[in-house]
Amino acid sequence: MSVLSKAGSGFAILAASALVLSGCAAADDEAATTEETTSAAVESLALKIGTALPVTGNLAFLGPPEEAGVLLAQADINAAAAGIDLELVLGDSGDTDNKAYETEIPRLLNEGVSAIVGAASSGVSLQFIDQVTKEAGVIQISPANTSPTFTDYDDDGLYFRTAPSDVLQGEVLGNLLAADGHATVAMIVINDAYGTGLRDNATLAFEAAGGSVVSTPSYNVGDTNFTSQINEMLAEDPDAIVVLAFDETKTIVPALIDAGFSNSGLYFTDGNLADYSADFEAGLIEGSKGTLPGPPSDTISADFKERANALWTANGGEELTSWAYSTESYDAVVLLALAALAAGSTDSAEMAAKMSEVSGYTGGGTKCATFAECAEIINGGGVADYDGFSGGIALNEAGDPTETAIGIYQFDADNRPQTYLG
């Protein structure tokens, strides 16, 4: 049976999911008991995974696509009936201002989860990584953490991510700024591991290309007034400004443009590359550019989008307008399920020992693109090499993906990001 647990009122839109997914799984189980087969029945492992994704806080716009990806992965894994019976326990990571994680992480751990998917924010993940990996001995895997801090973090081999380090995104961003002909750049930076890490790596790349970073004022989570930071940047008369922010972007960007800065000189990153059609006046950021790890949204499988949207909206969610980190969230759950299947165990340490193998880093495996295909390989005694909806993954010894891409986007007249064609 497929089970979906939910936390509090924040997950009211998903209240029907347990019934919907359980019903589908029950039908599949009933069919399986009556179907004649020549292969031996696969005894299922009961795997419980928690999520700590941003339902609230300054990254709440990432919550819907990430949760939709997780829910779709659960549906596909349970529908395969190939040895994993997956239960989800949904939670809210919040942010470092509302600190939802302080109650949610203990709740998830008390549920006996083998792994927690989240957080999206690097700064938030750093608030509970020790609690999850070192103290509880549970796997933590993020679909969106990009801070370089995690590469060398002492996590007992239990931390993984399906999004690349900002060493890569910073390089792409810095090179984009230079390629666009900018000689001087300013950055407004959220003061956490994500913001400072991306600032540092973008600066390295931009300065290596001959540019100069002239101002990098920071702000703290919870701040609402950015006048001093804006004045500091504009005083340096930069060619371009990079906004390394989350939901605060909705305040920062209009203030910059009202102060006379050109929208064509604005740059966004994964923390704020979103649909602003309902937030900004039409055309406000037309021509602005941004970077986002993962496949360009217009290259994500139509089947993936249709099924994720159908699952999300059927349970009360609004139509998805962003696919940021949806595929990485899906792939994180599939990798956990494959690792459990390969290990023959839902023990966190035993699963962690199989993550590099099932993601293709150790080599020698057979390529597969779905949980069902990979499970067939594993159940047949082989080694699976999963390439998911986000592309190749290949998690190395540090838990970092080694096969990934960074997309470049440009905002249209409706303030929606579109794949940049050059």
Question: Where on the chain are the PLM-derived regions?
Answer:
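C-terminal motif of bacterial Sec signal peptides marking the signal peptidase cleavage site
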Residues: 18-23
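Extracytosolic ligand-binding ectodomains
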Residues: 2-14, 25-422
